[in-house]
Each structure stands twice: as structure tokens, then as C-alpha cells.
């Protein structure tokens, strides 16, 4: 490994500081105290200008004799950001120009015994963009919202140039592992695993390509067994059943050039992999060993797979063509969100950060995440976690909201990028879909600023996304469904936003400032983007502001709001629904309630129409810096109201209400593989939580069905509409209780009383239990903590009666701080209410 301590300098100048690799210019300078926190106040402006210079990373290392004697010595750079020249002992060994690729250089000729020096010079992307020479009639003028001109010319995460939720941090460096590989024997070049499903058996076909001399004297051994270990610890349910090992000589059963070899293993009584909520996430370990003629193991490659079928169903139906993930023959309703890079400084993206975010998704009952195309391809660890958690990955290729100049060099570069990443990820059980790009087909169809670009650039789009990229993906992975763009109806500019087929992005609520009720006018087959902004909590705002900055229209707050019209939109929707908050903290809190309400309104509607709509992925799950945004989890991992609400509206069973004239309809959505018997109670209550009317019913909702379970005429309450609220309570056969609350007027018109809430904390072994009581109706009650960060079992909940309510806090869910005991928790606890 060449990770560890390196020297950082401006190119050609004296040392600036030490930098830990994986690391970057920003992580090094900030860690050494050479710059302030790039995220604090308006430091983004200073940070951006640093990258008009070139930088170099250097270190020395010892090349041992046992390494030097090998025939091949390969320098492996898993992540170079981005325009890099690599020097060994003063001699140029190679260059890199794509942060999405792994770079491998044969450096044997440059090494000598003893101490060696490696130096990597990162060239300024600004200089590259300024010097770029377009072909005739192909200059690109389009710039994404919040971005920078020329960002699309470089294979670097687009959002590093800025987005409408992210800063222009740019950065450069060695953001993943760097190391030497030395060998003299043949090597495994590629392993591809495919499956053929049969009656109570699965044939696993392992195709292995081997390179090097004396290949014909080598053997391959493939062993498959249930995997009992996870990347997080022991996996339950696996009993380590091994299949028989398969051994053959390379070339015995293969093509004329004796490569690759295909080995087939049959697994009887297989344990299938299912998405979260549908069954177990059973996984199998496939171990491929390359042996010499004496049986000595030369190399071992291990991959983990799930036995399943997974594709997109596009059957024709009453409304057009469905768009639904189909797993093991079962069509599922996708529930999840869009995932962006976890940090602006990519070397700070750790397995722990990824695990926390994905666990938060699973806890909120997600079964799907979309890796958005304006960022980067996450590490193998990310997909291992998705495999274990049952999170289907909609995987965008890294092209988003842009116009590209498809030169020969660019085509070659992206083809290698795609081939490499598809081969790296194709075996994962969670991989559900390859998508060519984000919003680019729709942009050429509908965005005037893109349509005004050269017709030659439009032709480049067609060649790139209708031919070059699909060809590269299918050559490396013929098993996984490919989708040209998102949104799309199937490509070729065939009405890319058609609601009756393909996937849609819906932004009239928010960007179009239409009311939440507008969601009910649309019946998308699959809504892969829709969203609503909110501010982060006060604790997060305090991390990047001084006290004088804490006004949403201050220079600092607007710098941490990258959508120019967003603050006005938040206030517009607030004025439609709530009274103006009395202070800054309350404004942040109410903005989060608005966000959660908006997303709930859309998801509830589309779940009520399961079968016509088969998926909702809201925008967005996470942030890459502290900011006002569409995220449901902020940069520090703090759940906003939306994420707590998603845990309910994405539940395997979810209750919702909607008005149909004078009738309030109560629906129960059941996404589980079992029918659900229920008892339903509908209440009309006053502000003191007294029951004014009650209706009940019983019944059963079928497997993967959404159905109305009660209809109530509420026209008789018109004269009391400012003094009442409506509550639907569903009790399931297993004792689970689901609730939903609605009002007949916006909350701003309700005659809410100021609640008196008492809270007592009890310590119960590995958890604390908070016992709450309210003197009156208290909608969207929120619990916060001054020091520690915590994830509660429930939050932003409605207190609808005088009975005691209990909220659990598991001690393992206490982060970034400490809570010693019940008294300490009580002291740190703060309760926010709407009234």
C-alpha cells in the first residue's frame, strides 16, 4: 500500500503540508490548518480559487527485492481526481484524465532497489477548460444550475463544479487507495457470473478470463457457498452449505484461443435474494482460484452474489405500459430516494458514512435507492451494503443535466469508464438497472437553453446515448436492464415525459409552485424524481454561521442555499399552509414539516394507485455539505422531518386519507407478501382531543394491494372545520397500529391551543423511553437534543389524545455526543410544537 503520509505542494514550489492519502488538496490544507473550514460561512469562494493552480502529491517508498524480481510491477490508482501526471523517480510513468476509472501503470522499468519517489501532479481543471478547443460549430454554452461552464469537458463528478444544492469546491487528489501489485504468473483478468433459474435449482455460470504466459498449464477452481459474514458482522440465516468445487483446465471447454473458461455449478434448494420487505437477503460467496499445474494457488478472486431474477416489467396494460421492478417473478412497488455523493471532499467518504446512510434508508422502509448521475460511482462497500440490506440500486451512469462534445478521445474515455464500472458492479444482487443519464433526453426535448445548442451536439447525444453507451453496457452486462435516460419513455426522443409509460420526474409541485393537491392529478407509472426543499435544523445551521448570519436572507444563509428561488418558494408554501413562525428556529422546523407533508401527499396518492404507479423515488436522500436542500438527511446525518415521515408512508402497510368531494376516503396500502386483516376507526376530534364522532370497520386487504377501507361523509362538520381534526387509526392482526391525521382547512386556520407537554425519561437497559403527555392536540411534535445527535424511533408525530405516548431511543442510535443517563437526556431534550 502507498496510502499514508504524502507531501502536498503547489506544483514546482516548496512543500505546503503533509496530507494523508486517501486525501485531497482540501483535506490536506484544512487538516494542516492552512485554510479555514471550506464549508464555513462563505469560504467556498476562497476555496474555489485555490484550484486555478496545479498541485503535486509526493512521497518516497522502498521497493523490496522480492518485488523487483517479479516480471510485472503495476501501480494501481483506484481514484485520481482528475487530470494527473504520474512520475516515478523523476520519469513520467503515465497520465490520468478520468476520476471514474481505475488507473493501472506498469512501472517496473522506473523502479530501483531501495528508496524510490512517486510524484503525482494534478493539473488545474480551470486551465484545461480555458484552453479547450472545440470543433467547428460545437461550442457548449449550457451550464447546469449552480454549476460552471465547461464542467462537462472533464470526466470529474459534475457536482464538484457546483449544483443547485452543492458548492463549487472543485478539489483534486488521490481520493481512493493507491498501491503496487507485483507478479510473474498468469492472472485472472475478468470474472463474470450469470444465473439460469430452474425448478428449485439455479445454475451459476462463472466465466473466467486469464492472461499471461503458460495459461494452458493452469487450472481454475470455483467454489460456491452460502455467505455467513457481512461487511458489518455476522449474517443470520446462512449455514455455510458449500457446493462441490469445480476444477478444470483453462481452455478445456472454451473458445479457440483457450480463453475464457466457463464453469457451471448447480445449486439445489436455493435461498433466494429478496428486496427489503419481501423476504431474506440470502447471499452466496463465489470463490475463483487460479492454480498452476502443481495445484498451487496463484490468485483468488471472491465475489458475492444473490440468487434472483431482477428486471423491469414493461407489459402493456389498460393505461399504457407499466414500469415495475420484477424480482423472482414478483412485481414490487419501489419505495426510496435519490442518493448523491456523501461529501464534497471525496476522500472523507468512509464505509461508516455509507453504512449509516443506507441503514437510515432501510430503517425508513426503503427498498430502492437511485445513485444519481451527476456524482460518482460509489465504492464496492456501498453495493455490498445494498446487497445485505435489500436495497435495489437504480444505477445512473455518470452523465447528468449536460451537453457533451463527443470527440474520439471522449468516446474512448467514457467507453473504458463504463466497461470498467459495469464489470466491477454487475455481479451485485442489488443491481437493478443501468440508466444512461439524468434528464438529458428530456432536456433536448423541452429545455430551451439546451435546445438552442448546436444540432451537431444533439447528434452527439443520439450517438452517445442511443449507440455508444448502450453497446458498452450490454457488452459487459447483458443481464441487467438498461434504460437510456431518466425520465424517458424508452429513448429516441419519443415523448420522454409521457405519464403512461417509462419513468417521470415531476417538479410542478416545488419548481412550478403548484399546490400539494396537484400530485393527485397525475398517475405516473414510476416517479423517479419529485421533491421539496427544507432548511436543516438549528444545530446544523450553527455549524456554518455566526449568530448575525441566522436569517434566511443573509449573505451566508443564501450562500448555503444554491437554488436562487428556493427561499421564496419555501415562504410561499409556508404562507399557504402555516402561520408565520415566531423565530428563526421555528422557521427551520416548519420548513421541514412542509417538506414532509409534500412528499407524503405524493407518495400516499401513488401508493393508493398501486398497479398503475409502481415506484416513487423522492429527491433526495442526503447532502454533501451543510445546506438548505431537498435532502431528508442532512450533511451531519441528522434526520429531517421527511425521513421520519418516510418511515411511515413507506411502511409495508400505510394508512392514508384523501378527500373526494364531501367524502373522506381512508385507504390501506399493503406491500407485504401476506394479506392483512384490519380494524379501522375514524375519529372527528376537537382541539382538546375529545371525540366528537367515531366510525369503525373491519376487513382484509390482499397481498400487494391498496384499497379504500372506509368512506366518511364529513360535510356535516363544515361549520366546525376550524376547531376539529380527523384521525384514522388502523389496527392490524399482529397488533400493529397505523395512524393518519387530516384537517378540513390548512393548519394556519386551525384554532390550535398552545400544548403543555410533559416528558419523563426512563432508562431500560440498552434504551431510553421518553413518556410524553400533551394537554391538547399537538401536531408535528418534534424532539431535539442540544448536544448529542440521536435517531429516535419516531419524531415529528401527532399527539392526538390525552393518553401517554412513548418514544424509544436505543443507545446505539446516539451519535456525535454522549448521553450518560436519564437525567442527562432530560437536560439535553428540547420539544418543538407547531402552536
Model-derived regions: residue spans:
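Substrate-binding clefts and catalytic carboxylate motifs of secreted carbohydrate-active enzymes
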Residues: 10-11, 170-173, 434, 471-474, ...
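Active-site neighborhood of glycoside hydrolase catalytic domains
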Residues: 388, 405-493, 636
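Loop/turn elements at helix/coil->beta-strand transitions in domains of secreted/extracellular proteins
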Residues: 332, 362-369, 387-394, 427-433, ...
